[in-house]
Amino acid sequence: MNAPPDFRRAASHALWLALALTFACPLPGLADEHPDARRQAQLRHLLLQDCGSCHGLRLTGGLGPALTPEALRGKPRESLVATVLMGRPQTPMPPWAGLLSEDDAGWLVDRLIEGEIAP
């Protein structure tokens, strides 16, 4: 039994749209760019000063939870990046999307997970 021509046309269009979107949208992690050295210094300062004001000057916790590698272990990177960018509603955690790009937030999260930012 053959499908009606309208169904085949719609299915064909849906397939082409899916393929186009697959190649037009970068895969997570492939488009990430590391900030340049100047921006990295700014991000380190922001992390230690602004984030540290709630997460503790040593990032071991305070008003907000600890941001140590041990505390972040097992948490999905994408979830941590989303928290940085979007904040946490009903908590003191503000959204930083107005000041940070997704690459900036990803770079910060990666540094925290690896323990590469120490006060």
Swiss-Prot record:
Name the Pfam families on file: Cytochrome_CBB3
- Give the Gene Ontology MF terms in alphabetical order: electron transfer activity; heme binding; metal ion binding
Residues at which heme c binds:
C51, C54, H55
Localization per Swiss-Prot or TrEMBL = Periplasm
Any one GO CC term of this protein is: periplasmic space
Q: Identify the SUPFAM superfamilies for this entry.
A: Cytochrome c
Q: Where is the signal peptide?
A: 1-20
Q: How is it modified after translation?
A: Binds 1 heme c group covalently per subunit.
Give a yes or no for keyword Lyase in this entry: no
Family annotation (Gene3D superfamilies): Cytochrome c-like domain (1.10.760.10)
Superkingdom of the organism of origin? Bacteria
- Which keywords annotate this record? Electron transport, Heme, Iron, Metal-binding, Periplasm, Signal, Transport
Function according to Swiss-Prot or TrEMBL? Monoheme c-type cytochrome.
What is the official name of this protein in its record?
Cytochrome c55X
| Recorded name of the encoding gene | nirC
